[in-house]
């Protein structure tokens, strides 16, 4: 079985690689459905990239660092574990955000919202269609989370050599 190790500088570079990967993917995703490129496309791309970089940095540093450190401590350091962590954390965070804390909080205002599939919010509460839309979007975002986690893992970890016996 392969064992992997890392160091603080490699972990920092791994987080930076994850921020860049996630931001580029979100920026590219923002162009899906565009039929033509106008004169503001570069400004739009840079704005989306900057915002996404802030979100990914906050998520990787504030949310993912503790579970990642625990998994590392217990020797769960392979790329499949990293991908599972990226998928689960991204899905939970996005789904919780889109559903106002998994339905724990109602909207502050008596608001109703609909999309082409029907109402998603009615009087400040999510409809079944709204829950399904949130689930779908969170699932798509979790795929991006998997790619980000793989990028972090690939930059941060290296196979241990035969002489290395201690935990790092």
List the predicted regions and their residue ranges:
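Juxtamembrane/disordered regions of integral membrane proteins
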Residues: 1-168
């Amino acid at each position: 079985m392969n064992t992997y190790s890392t160091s603080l500088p490699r972990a920092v570079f791994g987080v930076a690689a994850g921020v860049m990967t996630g931001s580029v993917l979100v920026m590219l995703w923002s162009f899906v459905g565009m039929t033509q490129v106008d004169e503001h496309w570069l400004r739009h791309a840079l704005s989306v990239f900057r915002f996404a970089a802030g979100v990914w940095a906050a998520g990787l540093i504030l949310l993912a660092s503790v579970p990642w450190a625990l998994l590392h401590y217990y020797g769960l350091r392979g790329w499949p574990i990293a991908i599972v962590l990226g998928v689960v954390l991204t899905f939970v965070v996005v789904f919780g955000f889109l559903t106002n804390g998994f339905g724990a909080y109602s909207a502050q205002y008596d608001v109703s919202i609909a999309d082409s599939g029907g109402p998603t919010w009615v009087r400040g509460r999510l409809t079944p269609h709204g829950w399904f839309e949130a689930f779908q979007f969170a699932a798509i975002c979790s795929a991006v989370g998997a790619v980000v986690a793989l990028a972090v893992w690939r930059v941060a970890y290296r196979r241990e050599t035969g002489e290395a016996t201690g935990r790092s």
